[in-house]
A protein has these predicted regions:
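Conserved glycine-rich cofactor-binding loop
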Residues: 14, 21-22
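Residue(s) in the substrate-gating loop at a strand-loop-helix junction
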Residues: 162
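Active-site helix of classical SDR
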Residues: 129, 178, 186
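The beta1-alpha1 cofactor-binding region of Rossmann-like NAD(H)/NADP(H)-dependent oxidoreductases
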Residues: 46-47, 68-80, 111, 238
C-alpha cells in the first residue's frame, strides 16, 4: 500500500511512533519518513533511538527527533508529547506500536509480569491517546469554540492489537487481555476524537518476522507461515504499509473506529 501513497503525502506533518527502534515500529517510522513526515521516535534505549534516527535520516529527507521513554509511565509520555510539540509545533498522528511479552501459563504467571505487559500495551496506548488529545488537539477544539475541527488538518491514531486478542494464545493472558482492551479503547477514542476530526483505528497483525517472534526459531516461523493463507509470516513492511494507508486521509479519510486483521488469513474474522 505504501506504493499508492502520494510523494510527500505527509509533508509538514509530525507523527509519533512508539516502539520505534526495531521490527514493526522501525518499519513504520521509516515508511512515514519516506513520505515526508517529521517524526518523534519513542523507545526505552536512547542509544538505539539515536542510531535509528540517523539511519532514517539517511534514507529519507527528514531528520527525526526522539525521546527515550517508558510508555507505561505517565510523566515520560507527557514529556515525550511536549517535546514533539515544542520541536515541531504540531502533532498530526500517533502510532502505538510499543510492546513486550513475558510468557507463562496462568498458574505460573507473576503479577509483576502481568502488570508490566498490560502497562506497556494498554497503559501506553491510553497515555499517548490522552496526551496527544490534551496537549495538541483539544486546545485547537476549544479555540474553535468547541466546534468540530473541520479545518482540513490530518489527524489520526493507529493502535496495535493482535490476532491473539480474538484467538487466544497460551502463556499470554496479559498480552491477549491488553490487546482486547486496546480494541475496545480504539472504538471509544474514535467516538471521542470525532470532535477533532481525528481518525482512530487499530491493526491486529498475525505472526510477523520481528525480534519478538524470533524465539520460536526458523522451523516455528515456517510452521506459522504455513498456517496462513498466503503461505508466509508477515514482514514488518507489510504492516508498515497498512499503517501508512490508515495515516493518509486520501486513502482512509472515511475510516475510523475499526480494527483491521492484517494477518495473512491465519484467522478469519
Amino acid at each position: 500500500m505504501a506504493r499508492v501513497l502520494r510523494d510527500g503525502a505527509f509533508s509538514g506533518e509530525t507523527h509519533i511512533v512508539t516502539g520505534a527502534v526495531q521490527g514493526i515500529g522501525r518499519a513504520v517510522a521509516t515508511t512515514l519518513a519516506e513520505h515526508g513526515a517529521q517524526l518523534l521516535l519513542v523507545d526505552l534505549d536512547a542509544g538505539r533511538l539515536a542510531e535509528t534516527a540517523a539511519e532514517i535520516g539517511r534514507v529519507a529527507q527528514v531528520k527525526p527527533i526522539f525521546a527515550a521513554a517508558n510508555v507505561a509511565e505517565e510523566a515520560h509520555v507527557q514529556r515525550a508529547v511536549a517535546h514533539a510539540l515544542d520541536a515541531t509545533g504540531v502533532v498530526n498522528g500517533v502510532v502505538n506500536v510499543a510492546g513486550i511479552t513475558r510468557d507463562a501459563r496462568i498458574p505460573k504467571k507473576s503479577f509483576d509480569d502481568f502488570k508490566l505487559v498490560v502497562g506497556v500495551h494498554l497503559y501506553g496506548t491510553f497515555l499517548f491517546l490522552r496526551e496527544v488529545a490534551a496537549q495538541c488537539w483539544h486546545a485547537q477544539f476549544k479555540n474553535a469554540g468547541n466546534q468540530p475541527l473541520d479545518d482540513g488538518v490530518n489527524r489520526f491514531v493507529v493502535n496495535f492489537s493482535s490476532v491473539s486478542a480474538r484467538n487466544g494464545n497460551v502463556g499470554q493472558i496479559d498480552y491477549t487481555a491488553a490487546k482486547g482492551a486496546i480494541e475496545a479503547a480504539t472504538r471509544t477514542a474514535a467516538r471521542e476524537f470525532s470532535a477533532y476530526r481525528a481518525r482512530v483505528n487499530a491493526i491486529a497483525p498475525g505472526p510477523v518476522n520481528t525480534p519478538m517472534l524470533a524465539a520460536v526459531g526458523e522451523e516455528g516461523m515456517r510452521a506459522m507461515g504455513r498456517a496462513t493463507l498466503v503461505g508466509r509470516v508477515a514482514e514488518p513492511q507489510d504492516i508498515a504499509s497498512f499503517v501508512c494507508a490508515l495515516a493518509d486521509p486520501r486513502i482512509s479519510g472515511y475510516v475510523t473506529g475499526q480494527v483491521f486483521p492484517v494477518n495473512g488469513g491465519i484467522y478469519l474474522a
